[in-house]
């Protein structure tokens, strides 16, 4: 029997927005259709946070940051939060907190998104996107790096 592989409690958040409209891309989770969020994911063993951010963007919304010569912005912000109780089974026993690094990805324009891990996507004005997410860290990242940066 294989040992269970647990998620690392180290993750990234990538707020994707369109430079021309300042609207934010929000993704509807499969495991909780009432939960909308930006791109998120775990940092894998041996991977840096920026590498994880680029990988997750490519996996979740099929945008290749390198091939498209886009600039992934490291917000230089890391937060720690309590892992939702219904998600703790994914982590090693006793792990209750996660450390998340924030990034932004500015696309020139809104585009059709090919999503692979979510039910749907929406482009929303930044205040509406911030209000939609259940994640305080996602809300704060949108407010700080899209709304207040405008």
Swiss-Prot record:
Q: How is its activity regulated?
A: Subject to product inhibition by pyrophosphate.
**Comment on bound cofactor:** Binds 1 Mg(2+) ion per subunit.
Q: Which domain of life is it from?
A: Bacteria
Disulphide-bonded residues: none
- Looking at the record, the residues that make up the Nudix hydrolase domain are 5-146
Binding positions (substrate): 7, 29, 40, 81-84, 135
Q: Which UniProt keywords apply?
A: Folate biosynthesis, Hydrolase, Magnesium, Metal-binding
State the reactions this protein catalyses: 7,8-dihydroneopterin 3'-triphosphate + H2O = 7,8-dihydroneopterin 3'-phosphate + diphosphate + H(+)
A Gene Ontology biological process in which this protein takes part is: folic acid biosynthetic process
One GO MF term, please? metal ion binding
What Pfam families has UniProt attached to this entry?
Answer: NUDIX
Q: Which residues bind Mg(2+)?
A: 56, 60, 117
Q: Would I find Nuclease among this entry's keywords?
A: no
Q: What is its EC number?
A: 3.6.1.67
Task: Give cofactor(s), names only.
Answer: Mg(2+)
Instruction: State if Magnesium is listed as a keyword.
Output: yes
- Which intervals of this chain are the motif Nudix box? 41-62
pH behavior is given as: Optimum pH is 8.5-9.
Q: Which InterPro entries match?
A: DHNTPase, NUDIX_hydrolase-like_dom_sf, NUDIX_hydrolase_CS, NUDIX_hydrolase_dom, Nudix_hydrolase_domain
Q: What role does this protein play?
A: Catalyzes the hydrolysis of dihydroneopterin triphosphate to dihydroneopterin monophosphate and pyrophosphate. Required for efficient folate biosynthesis. Can also hydrolyze nucleoside triphosphates with a preference for dATP.
Instruction: Name the family.
Output: Belongs to the Nudix hydrolase family.
Instruction: Return the protein name.
Output: Dihydroneopterin triphosphate diphosphatase
Q: What is the lineage of its organism?
A: Bacteria, Pseudomonadati, Pseudomonadota, Gammaproteobacteria, Enterobacterales
């Amino acid at each position: 029997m294989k040992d269970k592989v647990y998620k690392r409690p180290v993750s990234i958040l990538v707020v994707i927005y369109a430079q021309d409209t300042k609207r934010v891309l929000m993704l509807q989770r499969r495991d909780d259709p009432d939960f909308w969020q930006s791109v998120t994911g775990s940092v894998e063993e041996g991977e840096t946070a920026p590498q994880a951010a680029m990988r997750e963007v490519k996996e979740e919304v099929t945008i290749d940051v390198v091939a498209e010569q886009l600039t992934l912005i490291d917000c230089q912000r890391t937060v720690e939060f309590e892992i939702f109780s219904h998600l703790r089974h994914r982590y090693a026993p006793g792990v209750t907190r996660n450390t998340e690094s924030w990034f932004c990805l500015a696309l020139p324009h809104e585009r059709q998104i090919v999503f692979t891990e979510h039910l749907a996507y929406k482009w929303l004005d930044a205040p509406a996107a911030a209000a939609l997410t259940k994640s305080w860290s996602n809300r704060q990242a949108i407010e700080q790096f899209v709304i207040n940066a405008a």
